[in-house]
Curated annotation (Swiss-Prot):
<keyword id="KW-0694">RNA-binding</keyword>
<dbReference type="InterPro" id="IPR001351">
    <property type="entry name" value="Ribosomal_uS3_C"/>
</dbReference>
<feature type="domain" description="KH type-2">
    <location>
        <begin position="43"/>
        <end position="120"/>
    </location>
</feature>
<dbReference type="GO" id="GO:0003735">
    <property type="term" value="F:structural constituent of ribosome"/>
</dbReference>
<keyword id="KW-0687">Ribonucleoprotein</keyword>
<dbReference type="InterPro" id="IPR004044">
    <property type="entry name" value="KH_dom_type_2"/>
</dbReference>
<dbReference type="GO" id="GO:0009507">
    <property type="term" value="C:chloroplast"/>
</dbReference>
<dbReference type="GO" id="GO:0019843">
    <property type="term" value="F:rRNA binding"/>
</dbReference>
<dbReference type="InterPro" id="IPR015946">
    <property type="entry name" value="KH_dom-like_a/b"/>
</dbReference>
<comment type="subunit">
    <text>Part of the 30S ribosomal subunit.</text>
</comment>
<keyword id="KW-0689">Ribosomal protein</keyword>
<dbReference type="InterPro" id="IPR005704">
    <property type="entry name" value="Ribosomal_uS3_bac-typ"/>
</dbReference>
<dbReference type="GO" id="GO:0006412">
    <property type="term" value="P:translation"/>
</dbReference>
<comment type="similarity">
    <text>Belongs to the universal ribosomal protein uS3 family.</text>
</comment>
<keyword id="KW-0150">Chloroplast</keyword>
<dbReference type="InterPro" id="IPR036419">
    <property type="entry name" value="Ribosomal_S3_C_sf"/>
</dbReference>
<dbReference type="Pfam" id="PF00189">
    <property type="entry name" value="Ribosomal_S3_C"/>
</dbReference>
């Protein structure tokens, strides 16, 4: 059962919190969700185009959105703050990102504020690990080597366990298959176990590959 549902939704309210912190009337709730998706997509596209890769844990860990009547506060949790700020000076990158999101957003009543926070333990973030694997696969690095290195990163972060899965036409083979590796414990059916999860899609010259990562952080 543990692998058939999203591990984050399965533990929501127990060990996982919400990344969208706001409320709305039932009639306008769907519009609020679409708004969040637009903001996240705009941020991810901008970062992907402009980010400078200077280490193995560059990228977005997750995005948190808080809404008030007159303000939308967006907090971007990144592996390294400098990866976005180095584009064109210390603050130019954030200002340009804010302008781009504001254009997409089209709201006169709410102002937008974007902050960037550096995560304390980047090697324990499944999104950052998945982005690392995606970059390696695009460079035609062996998938086994990329998975092995990812597990080494997770061990540096003192995680209790990690499972990495890659599916699709791996290494350009005609028949799609699933390859996975696990190190340590990953108790997917234990609700009190804090497990971070990521599902990531990467386009390679051979086609689309799916990357899934489960990280067992702690037992509450």
């Amino acid at each position: 059962m543990g692998q058939k549902i999203n591990p984050l939704g399965f533990r929501l309210g127990a060990t996982q919190g919400h990344h969208s912190l706001w409320f709305a009337q039932p009639k306008s709730y769907s519009r609020g969700l679409q708004e969040d998706e637009k903001i996240k997509d705009c941020i991810k596209n901008y970062v992907q185009k402009n980010m400078r890769i200077s280490s193995d844990y560059e990228g977005i860990a997750h995005i948190e959105i808080k809404k008030r009547i007159d303000l939308i506060q967006v907090i971007i949790y990144m592996g390294s703050k400098n990866s976005l700020m180095l584009i064109e000076g210390p603050t130019r990158g954030i200002e340009e990102l804010q302008i781009n999101v504001q254009k997409e957003f089209h709201s006169a009543n709410q102002r937008l504020n974007i902050d960037i926070t550096e995560v304390a333990n980047p090697y324990g973030q499944p999104n950052l690990l998945a982005e690392y694997i995606a970059r390696q696969l695009k460079k035609r690095v062996s998938f086994r080597k990329a998975m092995k290195k990812t597990i080494e990163f997770a061990e540096q972060a003192d995680t209790k366990g990690i499972q990495v899965q890659i599916s699709g036409r791996i290494d350009g083979k005609e028949i799609a298959r699933v390859e996975w590796v696990r190190e340590g414990r990953v108790p997917l059916q234990t609700i009190r176990a804090k497990i971070d999860y990521c599902s990531y899609t990467v386009r390679t010259i051979h086609g689309v590959l799916g990357i899934k990562i489960w990280v067992f952080v702690d037992d509450k």
